[in-house]
């Protein structure tokens, strides 16, 4: 397929630009079109200068574990934080991590430092930045319960430090106004026993492996749980377990997970999700909200 890219005049940066990047290789679903430009900043200051000096649309991608990139073009610039933003520092019961850090690595570092309260991160695929963006949570814990502060670049290219209260968290979202790129976060846990923390983490991993299609090409939880309900139960009762459109299928193991069973397009996945929403709404009068995020344009 031929894509008509715009020859953008990009700001000078210390990091790197790549043009015409095929996004399907970067997503857990293994679907998606082409990004016009991907930018990897070399530092927070480099990122801030880029934001100040461009008027192009900006989107941010981590490891794309809870993201469907549509089949067409992702316009503008996709910011991808690299290894310069993957670090962990522990001090007592406080732990700071760059936003490209994997959540599983954060959980392990906390355990090794005897910091409890962050065990739930071990079962969540994704990065610290993605978790901050959507108030990720599992097994009774979430970002809002352990976050102390987050450093971010706002849409004006200013580097800001935001408190937990500033984030105005609610279920699977924050309440910030405007566009933000999170660069690192500081969490507070409690002093705990390393062996006990490791035991809890092993339990969470076992529960995840037993209940979720961890070996499939999936993107994590598809829909938010409506108040008073479990999304998977509504989906199951609406007759959607195993439902398939094209190469996309509702997981037989956990109904709130979609799978790329081979050859699926982003449109297959989105159409399947919308079919689920229609069936659940028709049967229960409940509108399921996407937890998975979308990026880019369809064909």
Swiss-Prot record:
Record's keyword terms, sorted: Cell cycle, Cell division, Cell shape, Cell wall biogenesis/degradation, Cytoplasm, FAD, Flavoprotein, NADP, Oxidoreductase, Peptidoglycan synthesis
The protein's Enzyme Commission number: 1.3.1.98
Compartment(s) where it occurs, according to its Swiss-Prot or TrEMBL record: Cytoplasm
Cofactor: FAD
Gene3D superfamilies according to UniProt: 3.30.465.10, UDP-N-acetylenolpyruvoylglucosamine reductase, C-terminal domain, Uridine Diphospho-n-acetylenolpyruvylglucosamine Reductase, domain 2
GO CC terms in record: cytosol
Biological process annotations from GO: cell division; cell wall organization; peptidoglycan biosynthetic process; regulation of cell shape
Record bears the keyword Secreted: no
Catalytic reaction list: UDP-N-acetyl-alpha-D-muramate + NADP(+) = UDP-N-acetyl-3-O-(1-carboxyvinyl)-alpha-D-glucosamine + NADPH + H(+)
Record-linked Pfam families: FAD_binding_4, MurB_C
Pathway the protein acts in: Cell wall biogenesis; peptidoglycan biosynthesis
Domain FAD-binding PCMH-type: 31-192
Gene Ontology terms, MF aspect: FAD binding; UDP-N-acetylmuramate dehydrogenase activity
SUPFAM superfamilies: FAD-binding/transporter-associated domain-like, Uridine diphospho-N-Acetylenolpyruvylglucosamine reductase, MurB, C-terminal domain
Active site annotation, chain numbering: 172, 221, 291
Enzyme superclass (EC): oxidoreductase
Family: Belongs to the MurB family.
Role, per record: Cell wall formation.
Protein name as annotated: UDP-N-acetylenolpyruvoylglucosamine reductase
Annotated source species: Anaplasma marginale (strain Florida)
């Amino acid at each position: 397929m031929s894509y008509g890219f715009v020859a953008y005049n990009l700001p000078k940066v210390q990091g790197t630009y790549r043009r015409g990047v095929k996004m399907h290789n970067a997503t857990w679903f293994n679907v998606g079109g082409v990004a016009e430009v991907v930018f990897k900043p070399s530092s927070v200051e480099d990122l801030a200068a880029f934001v100040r000096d461009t008027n192009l649309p900006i989107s941010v991608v981590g490891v794309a574990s809870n993201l469907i990139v549509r089949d067409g073009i992702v316009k503008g610039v996709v910011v991808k934080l690299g290894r310069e933003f993957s670090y962990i520092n522990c001090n007592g019961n406080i732990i700071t991590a760059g936003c490209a850090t994997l959540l599983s690595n954060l959980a392990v570092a906390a355990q090794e430092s005897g910091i409890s309260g962050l065990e739930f991160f071990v079962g969540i695929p994704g990065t610290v930045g993605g978790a901050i963006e959507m108030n990720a949570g599992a097994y009774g814990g979430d970002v809002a319960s352990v976050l102390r502060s987050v450093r971010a670049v706002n849409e004006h290219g200013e580097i800001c430090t935001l408190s937990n209260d500033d984030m105005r968290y609610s279920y699977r979202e924050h309440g910030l106004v405007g566009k933000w790129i999170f660069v690192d976060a500081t969490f507070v846990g409690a002093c705990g026993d390393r062996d006990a923390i490791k035991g809890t983490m092993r339990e969470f991993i076992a529960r995840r492996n037993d209940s979720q299609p961890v070996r499939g090409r999936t993107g994590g939880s598809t829909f938010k749980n409506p108040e008073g309900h479990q999304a998977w139960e509504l989906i199951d009762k609406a007759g959607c377990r195993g439902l398939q459109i094209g190469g996309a299928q509702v997981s037989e193991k956990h109904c709130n997970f979609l799978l790329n069973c081979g050859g699926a397009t982003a449109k297959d996945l989105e159409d399947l999700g919308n079919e689920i929403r229609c069936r659940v709404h028709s049967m229960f009068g409940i509108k399921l909200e996407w937890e998975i995020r979308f990026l880019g344009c369809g064909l």
